[in-house]
A protein has these predicted regions:
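Intrinsically disordered, low-complexity regions
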Residues: 38-41, 45, 99, 115-119, ...
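Basic- and hydrophobic-enriched, low-structure N-terminal and domain-boundary segments
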Residues: 1-141, 145-148, 471, 482, ...
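P-loop NTPase motor domains
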Residues: 129-421, 436, 446, 504-528, ...
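Conserved ATP-driven motor cores of ASCE-family P-loop NTPases powering translocation/secretion/packaging/pilus
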Residues: 413-415, 419-515
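Intrinsically disordered, low-complexity segments enriched in small/polar residues
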Residues: 32-34, 119, 272, 478, ...
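Low-complexity, polar-biased intrinsically disordered regions enriched in Pro/Ser/Thr/Gly
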Residues: 106-111, 221-231, 253, 476-494
C-alpha cells in the first residue's frame, strides 16, 4: 500500500510538470490561429529561439482549455493502458537477489550466520522478521559444519542443542566453557557423562503433572501407530496421572522421580478372580482420602479402579512396559536427580546439549520430555517473572529435528518470538515433517521467516523449493521452415513464463552453494559458510583444539522421610475386620 501511494505521488508530480509545456504550446497556437499552419511554424521557430516571448491574445484562454482537455484525455488513455499491463512481468516477476544487498539490510552487531555473505541480526524490532530458521539439507550437505557449529561459535545467545552422535558437544563445548557458559548435558550416548534430569523438579502444580503424563504417552508411542480403541491409553494415562500426582503431593523430594513411579506400580496388585481384593496401593490412596478427599490424584485413581480385574491387570502391564527404561540403573542414576536448572536458561549464559544416538531411539523420549518442559519453563519465566521477553535470547538448534518427537513444535514456533526465543529446525527433506506432522506440517515453514536450502536428493523438496522461487518472464524465439516449391522461413519472438529453477535444476545445485529465502525479499543463491573461516575455529576440535569431555554430576545424598511407611499387613487385617 505504501509503495502504491509513493507511485501515485510520483505520477502526479510528473503530470503537473508536463502540463507546463502544454500551456506553452497552447499560448503559441493561440497567437498563430489567424495565419494558419505557415504562421504557426514561423512562430514556433521564433519561440524556440526566445521561448518566453509569447503574447496573450483573445483566443489564448480557449486554446489553453482545448489543449488541457486533450492533455487530460491523453493521460486517461495512458493510465488505462498502464492499469492492465506489467511490462516484462506478464508471466511472473521472480528474480534473484544480491547476497551483499540482503546482508546490508539485515546484518547487525549480533547475528545469526546464514551463508558466507549473509547475516541475520538478533534484534527483531529492527528488521521485523522472526529468527526462526528452517534448514533443509541431505546427508553431507554441511548442515552441521555450515550452520550449526558456526552459529554456536558466535556465542551471542543461550543455546539448547540437539546433538546426534556427540559431535557438536566435543567440538564446541570447550569454546563455550571458555566464554563463560554453564554447560549442561543430557547424554543418551554415554550416560556416565550425563548430568541429571528429573522431570518432577519442574512440576509447579497439578496441571504440569498432567502435561508431563500426556507428553510421556505421546513420546513413548511409536511414530505412525494408530490405536483402534483409545480406552487403553486413556486408562493408562489416568493411572500414571494418579501416581505422579500422589508423589508430587505427598512424597519427599528424593522420592519424586520415575523410578519411584515404577516402585509404586509394583504395589498395584490385581487379582482377576477377586474384585474385592485390596492392594497396597489401594491402602495408600485410602489413607490419602482421609486427609484430602478432593485430591486430583485420588480422583484419577478412582477412574482407573473402574476397570475390571483382567482389564486393570492389562493396564498395569502396559504402564510398566512403557516405563521399563527407568528400571535400568544408568537411566535411574540420571533421572533420580536434576542438574538442568531450566529456570536459568533465559537468565544467564548457559548451553544445554541433548546428545542422542543416531541409530537408536530407545531413550529419545527423555529428550521429548526435556524439550517440552524447557518450553513450558521458559514461557513461564517470560510471562510470569519478566512479563514479556526473557533477558537472554535462547536459540534452539534442533539438528535432525524429526528424530525427536516434538508434537507441540508447530504451536511453539508461532508463539516464541515475543518471548525472545528462536528455533533453527534442521531437517533432511520436506517428506520428514510431512510424515511427522501430517496436516499441520506447513505451519513449520510458515512460522520460519528464513528458509535455508543446502541441497538434497528428495523429489518433493525439489518441487517445494522450485515453487517457492517462483516464475520469471523470459523472451523466447521460435523458428519455422516450410520446404517445397514455395518454401518459407520465419522467426517469431514472444514472452513466456519459466521457473527461476526447475525441480531438476534444484537437484543439480552445486554442493558449494545454497539457496536462502527471507520473508519479504528476493531469494539469493550464495556460497555456504566455511567453518574454517570463523575467528574462533582455533578453539574447537575442528581447528586443532582439544575435544571437550563433559563430566556428569554425582547423585546427591537422600534426605527426608520416605513415603512408604505404611504397615501393609496390619492395614490389610484392619480392612478385613
Amino acid at each position: 500500500m505504501r509503495l502504491k501511494k509513493t507511485s501515485q505521488t510520483t505520477d502526479l508530480v510528473l503530470a503537473l510538470f508536463l502540463y507546463i509545456p502544454v500551456v506553452w504550446a497552447a499560448l503559441l497556437i493561440a497567437q498563430s490561429l489567424g495565419g494558419g499552419l505557415p504562421e504557426l511554424l514561423s512562430n514556433l521557430t521564433a519561440a524556440l529561439e526566445q521561448p518566453f516571448r509569447i503574447q496573450w491574445t483573445d483566443k489564448s484562454l480557449l486554446s489553453i482549455l482545448v489543449c488541457t482537455g486533450a492533455y487530460l484525455m491523453g493521460l486517461c488513455l495512458y493510465a488505462s493502458g498502464q492499469g492492465r499491463t506489467r511490462d516484462g512481468e506478464e508471466h511472473g516477476s521472480a528474480a534473484w537477489g544480491s547476497p551483499r544487498q540482503l546482508n546490508a539490510q539485515f546484518r547487525q552487531k549480533q547475528n545469526k550466520i546464514l551463508t558466507r555473505h549473509v547475516r541475520l541480526g538478533l534484534d527483531t524490532h529492527k528488521h521485523r522478521r522472526s529468527l526462526n530458521v528452517l534448514v533443509i539439507g541431505g546427508s553431507g550437505a554441511a548442515k552441521t559444519r555450515g550452520y550449526v557449529k558456526p552459529n554456536i561459535l558466535e556465542a551471542n545467545s543461550n543455546y539448547v542443542i540437539t546433538d546426534p552422535k556427540m559431535e557438536v558437544l566435543t567440538a564446541t563445548g570447550g569454546y563455550l566453557k571458555r566464554q563463560g557458559y554453564d554447560i549442561r548435558v543430557l547424554n543418551l550416548v554415554d550416560l556416565s557423562q550425563s548430568d541429571g534430569y528429573n522431570p518432577f523438579r519442574y512440576l509447579r502444580d497439578e496441571k504440569d503433572a498432567l502435561k508431563l503424563v500426556n507428553t510421556l504417552i505421546q513420546a513413548t508411542t511409536p511414530k505412525g501407530s494408530h490405536e483402534s480403541d483409545p480406552f487403553w491409553s486413556k486408562s493408562e494415562t489416568a493411572l500414571l496421572q494418579a501416581i505422579i500426582l500422589m508423589l508430587f503431593q505427598e512424597a519427599p523430594e528424593y522420592e519424586q522421580n520415575f523410578s519411584m513411579v515404577l516402585r509404586v506400580l509394583e504395589y498395584a496388585e490385581v487379582k482377576e478372580d477377586d474384585d474385592e481384593y485390596v492392594s497396597p496401593l489401594d491402602l495408600l490412596f485410602r489413607a490419602m482420602e482421609y486427609e484430602n478427599p478432593e485430591s486430583v490424584a485420588l480422583r484419577q485413581y478412582k477412574v482407573f479402579k473402574q476397570a475390571a480385574g483382567k482389564t486393570a491387570k492389562s493396564i498395569l502391564v502396559s504402564a510398566a512396559v512403557r516405563l521399563a527404561p527407568f528400571n535400568l540403573p544408568q537411566i535411574k542414576a540420571v533421572t533420580d536427580h536434576d542438574d538442568m536448572d531450566l529456570y536459568t536458561l533465559g537468565e544467564r549464559k548457559c548451553a544445554l546439549y541433548a546428545v542422542i544416538p543416531d541409530n537408536d531411539t530407545t531413550f529419545t523420549f527423555l529428550v521429548s520430555l526435556l524439550y517440552s518442559q524447557i518450553f513450558q519453563t521458559l514461557y513461564y519465566c517470560a510471562d510470569q517473572i519478566h512479563h514479556g521477553a526473557l533477558p537472554c535470547h535462547v536459540h534452539f538448534i534442533l539438528d535432525e529435528a524429526p528424530s525427536v518427537n516434538l508434537p507441540g513444535l508447530p504451536r511453539e514456533l508461532a508463539t516464541m518470538r515475543s518471548r525472545n526465543i528462536s528455533c533453527s529446525t534442521i531437517i533432511q527433506n520436506m517428506a520428514q515433517i510431512k510424515e511427522l506432522y501430517k496436516d499441520s506440517w506447513e505451519t513449520i515453514p510458515g512460522n520460519s521467516d528464513t528458509l535455508l536450502y543446502l541441497g538434497g536428493n528428495e523429489a518433493s523438496t525439489h518441487k517445494y523449493i522450485s515453487e517457492a522461487l517462483g516464475k520469471s518472464t523470459i523472451d523466447t524465439k521460435t523458428h519455422g521452415q516450410t520446404k517445397g516449391r514455395s518454401g518459407s522461413y520465419s522467426t517469431n519472438f514472444q514472452m513466456s513464463g519459466r521457473e527461476l529453477l526447475t525441480p531438476d535444476e534444484v537437484r543439480m545445485l552445486d554442493n558449494r552453494y545454497c539457496i536462502l529465502f527471507i520473508r519479504g525479499t528476493r531469494p539469493v543463491m550464495d556460497e555456504k559458510y566455511e567453518l574454517m573461516e570463523h575467528p574462533a575455529i582455533r578453539y574447537t576440535m575442528d581447528g586443532g583444539g582439544p575435544p571437550y569431555i563433559h563430566r556428569g554430576t554425582v547423585e546427591p545424598p537422600i534426605t527426608g522421610e520416605p513415603l512408604f511407611q505404611i504397615d501393609f499387613d496390619n492395614e490389610k487385617e484392619n480392612a478385613a475386620a
